[in-house]
């Protein structure tokens, strides 16, 4: 699945499938980090999270779940700006917190309203990584909290 012009090629899994007349189920794509093939479940998750396709040497790549989480951890250590509560995020972005695109810092899923409200009601901070606001989705929140349980 080589593209003649990577600069104008698909930027999402959905666009990639439309461009090359493929279904999500038949798409085969490698991880940009480890070069392993993504599973069908990982491809669906990547599309659901609306993550971008990366082009290298005119070939598309995505990221497997393991590498996404690893990159999330690396970003936390390398690109941490600061942590803040919702009012600070709203003040900085000049938008209501529910309208701000905030992704999970581990799995990179965009947070839904409920996940943002969980941060607010639980008095949890959002973190700014590489000048982008991040938080925790419900799945990663429970995974993180399991480590704290006896």
Swiss-Prot record:
Forms homodimers. Interacts with ubiquitin-protein ligase UBE3A/E6-AP; this interaction stimulates UBE3A ubiquitin activity. Interacts with host TP53 and EP300; this interaction inhibits TP53 activity. It holds the Pfam family E6. Belongs to the low risk human alphapapillomavirus family. The cancer-causing human papillomavirus E6 protein has a unique carboxy terminal PDZ domain containing substrate but low risk E6s do not possess this domain. GO terms for cellular component: host cell cytoplasm; host cell nucleus. Plays a major role in the induction and maintenance of cellular transformation. E6 associates with host UBE3A/E6-AP ubiquitin-protein ligase and modulates its activity. Sequesters tumor suppressor TP53 in the host cytoplasm and modulates its activity by interacting with host EP300 that results in the reduction of TP53 acetylation and activation. In turn, apoptosis induced by DNA damage is inhibited. E6 also protects host keratinocytes from apoptosis by mediating the degradation of host BAK1. May also inhibit host immune response. Belongs to the papillomaviridae E6 protein family. It is found in: Host cytoplasm; Host nucleus. The keyword Phosphoprotein does not apply. A zinc finger (unnamed) spans 31-67, 104-140. This is Protein E6. Signal peptide: none annotated. HAMAP family: HPV_E6. InterPro entries: E6, E6_sf. GO terms for molecular function: DNA binding; zinc ion binding. GO terms for biological process: DNA-templated transcription; regulation of DNA-templated transcription; symbiont-mediated perturbation of host apoptosis; symbiont-mediated perturbation of host ubiquitin-like protein modification; symbiont-mediated suppression of host innate immune response; symbiont-mediated suppression of host type I interferon-mediated signaling pathway. Gene3D superfamilies: E6 early regulatory protein (3.30.240.40). Keywords: Activator, DNA-binding, Early protein, Host cytoplasm, Host nucleus, Host-virus interaction, Inhibition of host innate immune response by virus, Metal-binding, Modulation of host cell apoptosis by virus, Transcription, Transcription regulation, Viral immunoevasion, Zinc, Zinc-finger.
């Amino acid at each position: 699945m080589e593209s003649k012009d990577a600069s104008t090629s698909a930027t999402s899994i959905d666009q990639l499938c439309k461009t090359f007349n493929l279904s999500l189920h038949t798409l085969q794509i490698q991880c940009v980090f480890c070069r392993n093939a993504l599973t069908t479940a990982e491809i669906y998750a990547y599309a659901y999270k609306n993550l971008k396709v990366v082009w290298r040497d005119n070939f598309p790549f995505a990221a497997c779940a393991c590498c996404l989480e690893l990159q999330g951890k690396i970003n936390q250590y390398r690109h941490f700006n600061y942590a803040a509560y919702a009012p600070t995020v709203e003040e900085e972005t000049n938008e209501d917190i529910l309208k701000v695109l905030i992704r999970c810092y581990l799995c990179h899923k965009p947070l839904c309203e409920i996940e943002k409200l969980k941060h607010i009601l639980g008095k949890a901070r959002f973190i700014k990584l590489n000048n982008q606001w991040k938080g925790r989705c419900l799945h990663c929140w429970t995974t993180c909290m399991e480590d704290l349980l006896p």
